[in-house]
Every structure is written in structure tokens, then in C-alpha cells.
């Protein structure tokens, strides 16, 4: 697939946001040779996803903390589907995320999710792959980053409004998993609002930034 200038800029920006969030200074990806098992089950892969694998795909905290990036070392037949290429799973496979096979040549395709046992029903989780990679990185961050609030908080609408007023909202979200997930905060932070705006969990890769957000959020909500 030929990259346009805008594709290259967008991809660089996506990866830089993830590196900043996790405090990553070096790439940690699969080699081209290691990626070959994927091409025994699909003919094409979106360049953005391929480059994610070869740039960041081996980072454990980013990709294997709460939910899991499917890797070329996995038994790929476990995730075989006639219409979808599954590349991300919930840690007990209760939820699968995939790209429609008819969209695999698309630069920035939609990402679908399925939670039914037979995985016959799929719905759009994110309108673009870029949004999904960023949203999932921020979801994993609240469990993986070194400075984190231990546990979830239940919040009421007035407290959610205070969070929205205090912190910048990030321009991506998960539409269905966990009853929706929105993200707030600065570049090193993940303030996650889950379950239709009723749950809060947060973390940062920066100690000073965490202390700043914690000073505001620690008195908001009730521990679950």
C-alpha cells in the first residue's frame, strides 16, 4: 500500500502519542519475518496496523496487560472468522475486536467488536483503526502505568461534569466495550470514564502529573 504524506504524518502522530503516554523511548516491535504467520490467514493488512506491530507490538505493558494484542506467535486459528480479521482480545476472550476482511486494504478502517459467544454479531467499536489504537492504549494505561489510582470510583453526573470542566477530553473513545470509554487528561495521563459515565479510573507515566490530577480526583466519587 502506498502511503500518502497525510498517512505518514497521522501514523507518526499516533505512535508518538502512545510513546509519550507510556514513556517509551525506543521501538519494541516484531520483525518483518516474525509477522509472516499473519499472511497465512490473510492476504493484506492495513499499513497502520502492520507498522503498529513492527513499531510497538512487543511492548508487554501496552499490549498484554488487561486486554491483548493478538500476536503472530499466537495460535491464529483460535480467532479464525470468515468475515473478520481478529487482532485484539479481552483477556478471557469475552470480547474480540476485528477489521472486516473486505476492509483490509483500507488505510484506516473501522474496528468492530463482538461479545456474543458465537461471535455472529459485530458492531462498530471505533470509526477508525487510529482511534481504536489510541483508545485501547489509554485503556491499558490505567492498569499498566507506574502512577495509578488503585481501583475504580463510582461517580455521579455532577462529578463527571467537574471532570469534563477541569481536564481536556481526548478525541477518541470506545463506543461499546465497558458500556463506553472516554478519556481525559494531558499527554502523559489517562483519565478513563467508563460505564456510561459512571466509573472513573486514572493513571499517568509522570509522577508530577499524577500528583496534580490525583489532588483533584482523589476526593471525587466513591471507591467501588
Language-model features: where?
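Long, charged/polar, surface-exposed segments that mediate recognition or autoinhibition
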Residues: 120-146
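Short amphipathic beta-strand/extended segments with alternating polar/hydrophobic composition
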Residues: 96-101, 122-127, 213-217
